[in-house]
């Protein structure tokens, strides 16, 4: 007996070939009816025998396209309408509940790569080849549902051949919205920086909105050298690679913005790029032409290989092979290199032509967001790039490359994200929300906007139990980055039809995002909820793992506003999602000069030695000699209590130790001193450790559980031990290993004390210091050996890039407890 079902599929089901998959599954299971894209996902009307309908629904759930993610399938019995075939219908734009999830951009698939290099294929060497399994998604979407008119591909009407493929259910490009070829475009162009470009008058129209959607850069600048056919396109690629071989720097437009590109093996060009971009020491990421090229210079485990070739194609931090030679200025003094493989057709063509590794670094001016608009890039990057390889497909939102690594946790490989952007965002991260006393359902829960921190900003929009963490935005230090933050916020709210009614923010009153939240509260009356920085770190990992009960939370990072007004960063908390107690913290040390101590770690070292009365230790003499007169200035600030804030930050202690042993006196980028201190371990396997004393803290009448810990982690013995070893001539790699081991032991010992006091055996590790591979791998192993269950961030970075998710989780929990 025939029956009919109304089927709604929620998840990442648009832009990933889901409707063609449904069509084929319907044909396979003898189902009649239709499928369409709705604002709330994919909707299907299915008619057939009951057993065939069961098989059809099972196929939908178990054999969906690899790039899709089915969150739920809702079934309702409906009356038969008498269909005798199955069809794909035009999208439904009338649904009122915008619950569709949008796919991130996907790296070029193997089928498209084969066609790209097949001389007999009509898309041979076409720089924008794609299909339903790969290509741009989120970076070209302007509105939902995901159809070509709602993307930046609206400006490129399909040629008859592409239109036929698009309409053929048996074709891999059936309903592939970015589908294109040389005949219909888009196309690349070549522009030398010295060449002026003047837009034509024809770009001015009465309807500016229509113009923006249907006019292209080529309409505005027809005089540029355009790669309109195979010959012209190849000529641009060949010239670009010739310039790169000659030591030039190019700006090349990618999926989410421009890259600055140069020969990774040319030290003179690397030095020039650093000078032009004002990027003094931070390592460059490289793009390799193949896995074999990566294996030639880096150790690649099976897990790292899978990450490199995954649909996200992130930059993967790999250990350099012993004896591998790298150009000066690429990733000096580091044991790891950031490597990625080509993920766009143009990159495949350029890397194949060039033949070896290229530097691919974000196309931006120092401390500003990545450039996405061609005309703006010509101006902003004119002082950096010698020429531009751009195109006339508009980028709807800026995206940097994601960065990840594989670490060992409890003997098993785990992916740790360092920067979550292209290939991952805007996929939501589930955040189970508690109901309040009225049994409020998730869908009716307030929409929360978590505005994120000051550094490595990512914002997060919580709708129901879907947390939409934005792409990496950057450090909120200038108007340009704040504008990018506003753009990302507005885009998330618009695409997911989610207007926040609650704002979650960091406690720090001077953060730009905190001030923005204050202004919104004042002008719109929206509720604003504060989340302490380190509590949000811990809750970010708790929420990822669905942990509701209290945990021992170890939050180690560089900074964070504390309840006592000091700069925290070495915290061990007893925390649930709603609140926390400060169980332990690293002893405070002064930061002479405040922010200057971050840029000049020798000041940090001097401050620690001054606080611990170790200035006159013989091992401190080289530090004082290097500081010279600055030592007296630092001492004066600390004695008078002027511009010498106190901090418990582990990040700052690693900075101080790095400077003390002579590794890094001046940090050229955020975290450099600590990064180099970890790199100095250089395979040292000593189990010896300095001491970090655990002592009972003294409370005062004003003390609270929020600001006064039960015990202190006293780092005076650590610094004394380092000074003793410096005096004795102990090698720096041994000192670095012993210092790291000291923190591992202190964490385990303190967690054992907390477990005895609170009967908690789950430990959560979060905060930027846990990007330190040595520390997180040794700490997780030691905690597990001690019988603890350990949770770390998996879908988000442990650094401030995961903080907004934690802010949203804290606010949600507090609302649920009211």
State where each predicted segment sits.
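A phosphate-binding glycine/aspartate-rich beta-alpha loop in the early core of alpha/beta enzymes
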Residues: 77, 249, 257-320
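Intrinsically disordered, low-complexity, mixed-charge
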Residues: 1-178, 182, 186-189
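A contiguous, well-structured pocket-lining segment that forms one wall/lid of small-molecule binding clefts
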Residues: 185-187, 453-483, 487-491, 607-760, ...
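Short glycine-rich phosphate-binding loop at a beta-alpha junction
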Residues: 251, 497-509, 528, 758-769
């Amino acid at each position: 007996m025939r029956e009919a079902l109304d089927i709604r599929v929620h998840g990442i089901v648009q832009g990933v070939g889901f409707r063609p998959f449904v069509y084929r599954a319907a044909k396979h299971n003898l189902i009649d009816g239709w499928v369409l894209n709705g604002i709330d996902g994919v909707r299907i009307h299915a008619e057939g025998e009951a057993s065939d309908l069961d098989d059809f629904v099972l196929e939908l759930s178990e054999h969906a396209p690899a790039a899709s993610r089915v969150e739920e399938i809702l079934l309702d019995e409906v009356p038969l309408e008498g269909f005798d075939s199955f069809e794909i219908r035009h999208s439904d734009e009338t649904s009122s509940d915008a619950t569709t999830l949008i796919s991130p951009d996907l790296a070029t698939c193997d089928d498209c790569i084969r066609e790209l290099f097949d001389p007999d294929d009509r898309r041979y060497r076409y720089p924008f080849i794609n299909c339903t399994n790969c290509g741009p998604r989120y970076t070209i979407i302007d509105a939902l549902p995901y159809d070509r008119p709602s993307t930046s591909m609206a400006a490129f009407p399909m040629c008859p051949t592409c239109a036929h493929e698009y309409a053929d259910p048996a074709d891999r490009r059936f309903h592939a919205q970015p589908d294109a070829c040389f005949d219909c475009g888009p196309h690349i162009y070549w522009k030398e920086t010295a060449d002026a470009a003047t837009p034509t008058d024809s770009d001015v129209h009465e309807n500016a909105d229509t113009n923006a959607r249907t006019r292209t850069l080529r309409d505005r600048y027809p005089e540029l050298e355009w790669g309109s056919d195979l010959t012209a396109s190849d000529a641009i690629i060949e010239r670009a690679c010739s310039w790169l071989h000659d030591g030039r720097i190019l700006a090349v437009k990618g999926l989410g913005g421009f890259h600055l590109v140069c020969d990774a093996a040319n030290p003179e060009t690397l030095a020039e790029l650093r000078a032009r971009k004002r990027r003094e020491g931070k390592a460059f990421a490289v793009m390799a032409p193949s896995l074999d090229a990566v294996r030639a210079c880096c150790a690649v485990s099976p897990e790292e290989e899978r990450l490199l070739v995954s649909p996200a194609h992130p930059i993967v931090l790999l250990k350099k092979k012993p004896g591998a030679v790298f150009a000066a200025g690429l990733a000096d003094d580091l044991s790891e290199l950031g490597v990625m493989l080509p993920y766009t057709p143009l990159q495949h063509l350029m890397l194949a032509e060039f033949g070896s590794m290229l530097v691919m670094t974000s196309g931006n001016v120092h401390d500003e967001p990545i450039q996405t608009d061609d005309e703006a890039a010509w101006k902003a990057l004119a002082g950096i790039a010698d020429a531009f390889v751009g195109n006339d497909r508009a980028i709807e939102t800026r995206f940097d490359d994601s960065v990840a690594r594989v670490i060992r946790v409890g003997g098993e490989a785990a992916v740790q994200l360092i920067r979550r952007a292209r290939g991952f965002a805007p996929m939501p991260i589930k955040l189970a929300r508690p109901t309040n006393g009225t049994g409020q359902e998730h869908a009716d829960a307030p929409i929360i906007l978590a505005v994120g921190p000051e550094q490595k900003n990512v914002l997060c929009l919580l709708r129901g139990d879907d947390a939409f963490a934005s792409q990496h935005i950057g450090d909120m230090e200038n108007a340009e980055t704040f504008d990018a933050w506003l753009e990302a916020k507005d885009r998330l709210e618009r695409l997911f039809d989610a207007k926040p009614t609650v704002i979650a923010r960091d406690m720090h009153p001077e953060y730009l995002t905190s001030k923005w939240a204050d202004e919104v509260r004042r002008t719109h009356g929206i509720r604003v909820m504060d989340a302490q920085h380190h509590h949000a770190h811990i809750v970010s990992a708790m929420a990822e793992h669905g942990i509701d009960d209290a945990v021992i939370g170890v939050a180690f990072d560089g900074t964070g506003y504390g309840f006592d007004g000091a700069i925290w960063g070495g915290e061990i908390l007893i925390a649930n999602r709603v609140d926390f107690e400060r169980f332990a913290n690293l002893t405070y040390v002064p930061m002479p000069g405040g922010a200057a101590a971050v840029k000049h770690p020798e000041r940090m070292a001097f401050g620690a030695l001054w606080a611990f009365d170790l200035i006159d230790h013989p091992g401190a003499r080289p530090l004082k000699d290097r500081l010279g007169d600055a030592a007296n200035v630092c001492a004066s600030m600390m004695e008078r209590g002027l511009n010498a804030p106190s901090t418990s930050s582990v990040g700052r202690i690693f900075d101080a130790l790095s400077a003390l042993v002579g590794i890094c006196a001046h940090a050229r980028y955020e975290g450099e001193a600590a990064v180099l201190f970890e790199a100095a371990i250089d395979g040292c396997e000593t189990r010896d450790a300095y001491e970090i004393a655990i002592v009972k803290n003294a409370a005062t009448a004003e003390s609270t559980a929020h600001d006064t810990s039960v015990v202190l982690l006293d780092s005076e013995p650590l610094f004394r031990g380092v000074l003793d070893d410096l005096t004795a001539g102990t090698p720096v790699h041994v000192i670095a290993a012993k210092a790291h081991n000291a923190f591992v032991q202190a964490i385990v010992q303190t967690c054992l004390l907390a477990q005895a006091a609170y009967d908690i055996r789950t430990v959560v590790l979060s905060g930027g210091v846990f990007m330190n591979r040595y520390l997180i791998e040794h700490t997780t192993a030691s905690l597990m050996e001690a019988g603890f269950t350990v949770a770390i961030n998996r879908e988000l970075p442990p650094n401030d890039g995961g903080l907004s998710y934690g802010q949203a989780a804290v606010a949600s929990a507090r609302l649920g407890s009211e």
